[in-house]
Amino acid sequence: MRTFGVEEELLIVDPVTGEPLALADALLTGRKLAADDAPDKPRILDPHDPTRDDGDTGLTAELKLEQIETQTRPCLNYEELLLQIRQGRALADTAAEKHNARVAALATSPIASTTHTTPNPRYATMQERFGLTVHEQLTCGFHVHTFVESPEEGVAVIDRLRDKLAVLTALSANSPYWNGVETGFESYRTQAWNRWPTSGPSQIFGTHSMYRRVVTRLLDSGVLLDEGMIYFDARLSRNHPTVEVRVADVCLQAEDAALIAVLVRALVESASREWRAGVDPAPVPTVLLRMAAWQASNCGLRGDLLDFGTFRPAPAEEVVEALVDYVAPVLAEQDELELAWEGVRRILDRGTGSEQQRLAMQECLAGNPEAAAGLAAVVAHAVDVSMRRTEAVTAREKAPVLLRVRQS
């Protein structure tokens, strides 16, 4: 069974107004800045903080000071991963509460605000080169790492799951509001994110050597700062023996996040088996995949998606069910088929995070017609749901971190 782990980006917010707060540095006080893009000399300001892991840490800096990233260790099953997601959220929220703030699993901010880029040389260069794209990039995604035995297997997996990733965007959609505006999208984060030069679906590579040639040519173009800006929907991790899938919004419910990860792991295993059986990847044009991603971002589960077999419109529920059917043999072997169906039906019945945000807005406006009050209520609802059933991290528990992800 392959191990898997996740990274969640969370919004730091004022618990009353809902406004994003530039407090990431404060939340990381006493912890190493362990993100890939952290400065070369991480600060340790309070070595006696009982929530600090003496190795890496479960909280890391991101592009914006209004967000914080949590990371899990590699896990073997849904229950273990769900627990670590909850612990990571609790760790971040506990740190935020020390500064009269909270964290919320929101993929974009419903409240308009001025954002602040995390101060380090790399981000400063990105700000200078990419301008408004960086300024407006307060987006929170959900990244799933799944073990692969080799880069060759990883590229084969990427080639064979690329046509199915838009379904995960629809399932995880959690960003209908953007800076005080109802966007009309279910995952507006996807729209904001896809302004980067390399973001979105990638071509079929065929071999690891071709993958490396493409990456090298992108770097040689001079447009990108470094390999960290290879933002494909699915890519080989630079730091772990994993495929990293990057298409999902951060999910309101921790249970939904763990479900997305389970589906990703099953997709990776299914793709690997196809590769080993000599099944070629579906030759879907990249431009068609971009359209499928756009449709998923726009409609979520409320309308039609592009079926990943025919790429013709089909009811979202049918496309989601087809995805579960596709990975059902792997899920059954891993004793996760029933929980996957339960999780998918829960989202279909209850609605995505975007639908829940809109409902919170409507319920508030029924008693208070001011839009600002409604958006603040959306954030307050998100804080409550994000932390629901989340277990506090005690001094005896290590902060969750993404270590080497392996197969057992």
Swiss-Prot record:
Gene Ontology biological process terms, A to Z: modified amino acid biosynthetic process
Reaction catalysed by this enzyme: L-cysteine + L-glutamate + ATP = gamma-L-glutamyl-L-cysteine + ADP + phosphate + H(+)
Top EC class, one word: ligase
Chain positions covered by the region annotation Disordered: 37-57
EC number: 6.3.2.2
Alphabetical keyword list: ATP-binding, Ligase, Nucleotide-binding
Keyword ATP-binding applies: yes
Biased segments, Basic and acidic residues type: 37-55
Pfam (any one): GCS2
Xref: InterPro entries: GCL_type2/YbdK_subfam (IPR050141), GCS2 (IPR006336), Gln_synth/guanido_kin_cat_dom (IPR014746), YbdK (IPR011793)
A GO molecular function held by the record: ATP binding
Domain of life from the UniProt record: Bacteria
NCBIfam families assigned to the protein according to its UniProt record, in alphabetical order: gshA_cyan_rel, PRK13517.1-1
HAMAP family: Glu_cys_ligase_2 (MF_01609)
Function according to Swiss-Prot or TrEMBL: ATP-dependent carboxylate-amine ligase which exhibits weak glutamate--cysteine ligase activity.
Family from the record: Belongs to the glutamate--cysteine ligase type 2 family. YbdK subfamily.
Name the UniProt record assigns to this protein: Putative glutamate--cysteine ligase 2-2
